[in-house]
From Swiss-Prot:
HAMAP family: Ribosomal_uS17_A
Coiled coil (UniProt feature): none
One BP term from GO: translation
Annotated gene: rps17
Keywords: Ribonucleoprotein, Ribosomal protein, RNA-binding, rRNA-binding
Keyword Acetylation in record: no
One Pfam assignment: Ribosomal_S17
GO function terms (MF aspect): rRNA binding; structural constituent of ribosome
Function according to Swiss-Prot or TrEMBL: One of the primary rRNA binding proteins, it binds specifically to the 5'-end of 16S ribosomal RNA.
CDD domains: Ribosomal_uS17
PANTHER family listed in its UniProt record: 40S RIBOSOMAL PROTEIN S11 FAMILY MEMBER, 40S RIBOSOMAL PROTEIN S11-RELATED
UniProt name for this protein: Small ribosomal subunit protein uS17
Gene3D superfamilies for the chain: 2.40.50.1000
Similarity comment text for this entry: Belongs to the universal ribosomal protein uS17 family.
Length: 114
């Protein structure tokens, strides 16, 4: 397991994904943000929605804005819909992915299926 430069707990599971920042050779750099996973339908991909405040000069107030980012979801982290995750910027992994999920900060409560 490598040290990636962030103060987060490494995942308990081990994977052999070469694009994993913990077990592969993917380096992270630049920004890192928190967000909520809104979709996990893609293969090893999640869509993370983050909220931020934008200042409106005319009204001298802030408004809440949202943006969606595609991020790589390694097998050892395995984030699901509703999870609060920390994503970090990295090199372009594909046409739309240049972020990777580094840690799950809070798991979503899921209903038990019977």
């Amino acid at each position: 397991m490598r040290e990636i430069g962030l103060r987060v707990q490494p995942p308990a599971e081990v994977c052999n994904d070469p694009k994993c920042p913990w077990h592969g050779n993917l380096k992270i750099h630049g920004r890192y943000v928190e967000g909520i996973v809104v979709s996990d339908k893609g293969k090893k991909t999640v869509v993370v929605e983050r909220q931020y405040y934008h200042y409106l000069k005319k009204y001298e107030r802030y408004e809440l804005r949202k943006s969606k980012v595609h991020a790589h979801n390694p097998e050892c982290i395995n984030a699901k819909v509703g999870d609060k995750v920390l994503i970090a910027e990295t090199r372009p992994i594909s046409k739309t992915k240049s972020w990777v999920v580094v840690a799950v900060l809070q798991r979503a409560e899921r209903a038990e299926e019977v």
